């Protein structure tokens, strides 16, 4: 029997096992409905090799705002890494680095594309190589994944990392996805490999907030995406009016997340977001587990992230005023409602019982199944995610708004 996630969600849930019409899955009892796909299909590495290429894209149409000691710039500079499928024998990736510089592979893209493209949004203080194993996993299953360093929220941002630029980040994702699809010369094979009619976005923490803006915001949403996955999204700042558009979305949560607790992050987003939306709660999982981080000696490895975020906020302007202006520009002031942001950073402690490797594996299963369901039209993948995933894994709860 499923365990309840909490009264904050009770009125919104349609529990796993109920008849549903989500992502092409018909009601229980239909004779022509497919069986759920096997979890091993989403856990195992895919049939493609994986390689990476590094780029620096410059959007000359949008500025980078001033930030502390940084005067700003008339353009937005976006170092980015692309993970892409190759032939199985050409499994070679560029050396991961925090900011630019790695010599990328020149391996050709697999010839049986084009492939869906996924834009990945990193979290606060992080970078484009965040959760690299997840990106490799998706690329091995036939996805082109691109992740930029956002100008003012990455760990080495000029003037110090800030939340204030969050509202500009969805357009950064759209820009780099378009840039890859338009490449020529020695990178023309990447452009040919991208199916721009099949696009998804995903992200973690502040990048999860970026994903929510791109999916739901009445003005800043991205028109050309079909699916989204938000891991531990920062959502306490978004009011009910924020969720103005419907998009098939998976929200990933860890019940032991100290940085973005379930109730004020993914749970709040699930409460307000229009269907179809799925909430996956990983019992005992935390925040940094979505990057695969394991610190076995710690009661909760989020402690290291808590200290880093608290120090960054204490040492600079968090940028809330700038973020509010961006979110409410040409939109109702009700898109912003910080009433749930009433706790200090990591004020509530939780016991982490799920290891980071297991958490990242389960997150990858959920993300891949969702993208397969939406971007490749696989009803068996949708049925797995909404019915079999929780049944197969006692540490997983799944709730659905069809």
Question: What are the functions of these language-model segments?
Answer:
Residues 24-27:
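C-terminal motif of bacterial Sec signal peptides marking the signal peptidase cleavage site
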Residues 29-31:
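Bacterial signal peptide processing site
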Residues 33-119, 140, 307-356, 390:
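Domain-level recognition of soluble alpha/beta enzyme cores
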Residues 107-115, 120-157, 258-262:
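Short substrate-entry loop that stabilizes the transition state in hydrolases
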Residues 163-196:
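Alpha/beta-hydrolase active-site loop
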Residues 203-207, 211:
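Gly/Ala-rich beta-loop-alpha elbow adjacent to hydrolase catalytic centers
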Residues 222-290:
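The feature captures the conserved acid-bearing segment of alpha/beta-hydrolase catalytic domains
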Residues 275, 284-286, 292-402:
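Alpha/beta-hydrolase-fold serine-hydrolase catalytic core, especially in secreted/extracellular enzymes
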């Amino acid at each position: 029997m499923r365990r309840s996630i909490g009264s904050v969600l009770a009125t919104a849930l349609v529990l796993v096992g109920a008849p549903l019409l989500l992502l092409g899955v018909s009601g229980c009892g239909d004779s022509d409905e497919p069986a759920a796909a096997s979890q091993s299909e989403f856990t195992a590495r895919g049939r493609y090799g994986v390689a990476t290429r590094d780029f620096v894209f410059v959007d000359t149409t949008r500025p980078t705002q001033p930030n502390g000691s940084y005067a700003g710039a008339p353009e937005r500079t976006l170092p980015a890494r692309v993970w892409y499928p190759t032939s199985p024998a050409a499994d070679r990736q560029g050396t991961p680095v925090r900011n630019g510089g790695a010599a990328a592979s020149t391996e050709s893209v697999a010839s049986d594309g084009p492939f869906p493209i996924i834009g990945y949004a990193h979290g606060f203080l992080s970078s484009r190589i965040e959760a690299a194993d997840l990106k490799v996993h998706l690329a091995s299953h036939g996805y082109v994944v691109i992740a930029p360093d956002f100008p003012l929220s990455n760990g080495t941002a000029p003037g110090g990392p800030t939340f204030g630029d969050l509202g500009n980040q969805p357009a950064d994702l759209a820009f780099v996805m378009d840039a890859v699809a338009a490449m020529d010369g020695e990178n023309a094979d990447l452009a040919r490999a991208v199916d721009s009619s099949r696009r998804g976005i995903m992200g973690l923490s502040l990048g999860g907030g970026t994903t929510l803006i791109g999916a739901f915001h009445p003005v800043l949403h991205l028109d050309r995406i079909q699916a989204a996955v938000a891991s531990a999204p920062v959502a306490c700042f978004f009011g009910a009016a924020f969720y103005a558009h419907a998009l098939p979305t998976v929200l990933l949560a860890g019940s032991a997340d100290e940085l973005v607790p379930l109730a004020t992050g993914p749970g709040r987003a699930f409460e307000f977001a229009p269907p179809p939306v799925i909430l996956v709660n990983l019992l005992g999982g935390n925040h940094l587990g979505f990057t695969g981080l394991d610190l076995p000696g710690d009661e909760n490895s989020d402690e290291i992230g808590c200290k880093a975020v608290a120090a960054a906020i204490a040492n600079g302007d968090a940028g809330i005023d700038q973020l509010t202006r961006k979110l409410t520009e040409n939109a109702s002031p009700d898109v912003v409602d910080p009433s749930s942001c009433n706790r200090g950073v990591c004020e509530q402690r939780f016991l982490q019982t799920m290891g980071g490797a297991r958490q990242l594996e389960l997150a990858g299963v959920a993300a891949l199944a969702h993208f397969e369901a939406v971007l490749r039209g696989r009803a068996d993948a949708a049925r797995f995610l909404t019915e079999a995933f929780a049944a197969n894994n006692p540490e997983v709860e799944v709730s659905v708004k069809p």
